[in-house]
Amino acid sequence: MVTINNAHSELIHDAVLDYYGKRLATCSSDHTVKIFEVEGETHKLVDTLQGHEGPVWQVDWAHPKFGVILASCSYDGKVLIWKEVNGRWSQIAAHEVHSASVNSIQWAPHEYGPLLLAASSDGKVSVVEFKENGTTSPIIIDAHSIGANTACWAPATLQQQSNQGTSGSASPQQVRRFVTGGADNLVKIWKYNSDAATYLLEHTLEGHSDWVRDVAWSPTVLSRSYLASVSQDRTCIIWTQDSKEDTWKKTLLKEDKFPDVLWRASWSLSGNILALSCGDNTVTLWKENLEGKWEPAGQVTE
């Protein structure tokens, strides 16, 4: 375990390793993003990225096929894109379509290209495509009327669609979906519609009695899809869908409430373990048993 002391002068809100686990990006209320090189149990500060004018809530690494690229989002309403070339970091783009704090960002599955999803307190969610000529093409959606707190892509999937040609064969098409959570206590699922050239609301999931703080779509591509949502109401709901046509089934992770607000949810890479971050400074692990019940699988300690 690597421990970095005094990394920032104020509260740290996010810390994310890159694809290879060699670089660590952190962000803070001190308005900065910091990049560390990590080797074994040692670390070295490489650069401090300055450009935001408010607390920086989240960072996310792009897939390495696009280069060494990092996105950051802030209370200042901006999403900044940073790139490292020959050991030097610089800001290469700014996404400034939101009128309030941008609370969450996530790069799409790399199969979709350089697409970035952002959720804002202005109630809107944006998907911005970064094109090779340096221009951007944003899609802006009215998602949650009193604020969008979080957004997460579904794993990349293909859907068979009938070919209009004479062969009558089927050609697989990308199915781009993401989930959002808002201050309206709702979880919403959105799907790209090529005819409308935007993302349309597919499902609205009701179950929380307070702000939805985080949503996480399991990375496992199986016949059943899993979503986790956590809330200010101190509950975690697991949502499952057995096929693309079915409705989503709601299951409380546990009957009694957690001791404090649940802030973050994160699936393991294999999708079988769910980690939950609670306001009482604990991180608990959960897994589904053979009967479909969720049970504790441990606790993360220092």
UniProtKB/Swiss-Prot annotation:
RNA-binding keyword on record: no
Protein family membership: Belongs to the WD repeat SEC13 family.
Any single GO BP term: positive regulation of TOR signaling
Subunit structure: The COPII coat is composed of at least 5 proteins: the SEC23/24 complex, the SEC13/31 complex, and the protein SAR1. Component of the nuclear pore complex (NPC). NPC constitutes the exclusive means of nucleocytoplasmic transport. NPCs allow the passive diffusion of ions and small molecules and the active, nuclear transport receptor-mediated bidirectional transport of macromolecules such as proteins, RNAs, ribonucleoparticles (RNPs), and ribosomal subunits across the nuclear envelope. Due to its 8-fold rotational symmetry, all subunits are present with 8 copies or multiples thereof.
Mode of membrane association: Peripheral membrane protein
Gene this protein is translated from: SEC13
The keyword Transport is annotated on this UniProt entry: yes
PROSITE patterns tied to this protein: WD_REPEATS_2 (PS50082), WD_REPEATS_REGION (PS50294)
Protein's name according to its UniProt entry: Protein transport protein SEC13
An example molecular function term from Gene Ontology annotations: structural molecule activity
UniProt keyword terms in alphabetical order: Cytoplasmic vesicle, Endoplasmic reticulum, ER-Golgi transport, Membrane, mRNA transport, Nuclear pore complex, Nucleus, Protein transport, Repeat, Translocation, Transport, WD repeat
Matches recorded under Pfam families: WD40
Location relative to the cell: Cytoplasmic vesicle, COPII-coated vesicle membrane; Endoplasmic reticulum membrane; Nucleus, Nuclear pore complex
WD repeats: 7-46, 51-92, 97-138, 160-200, 207-249, 257-296
Subcellular location, principal: membrane
Role: Component of the coat protein complex II (COPII) which promotes the formation of transport vesicles from the endoplasmic reticulum (ER). The coat has two main functions, the physical deformation of the endoplasmic reticulum membrane into vesicles and the selection of cargo molecules. It also functions as a component of the nuclear pore complex (NPC). NPC components, collectively referred to as nucleoporins (NUPs), can play the role of both NPC structural components and of docking or interaction partners for transiently associated nuclear transport factors.
One GO CC term on file: COPII vesicle coat
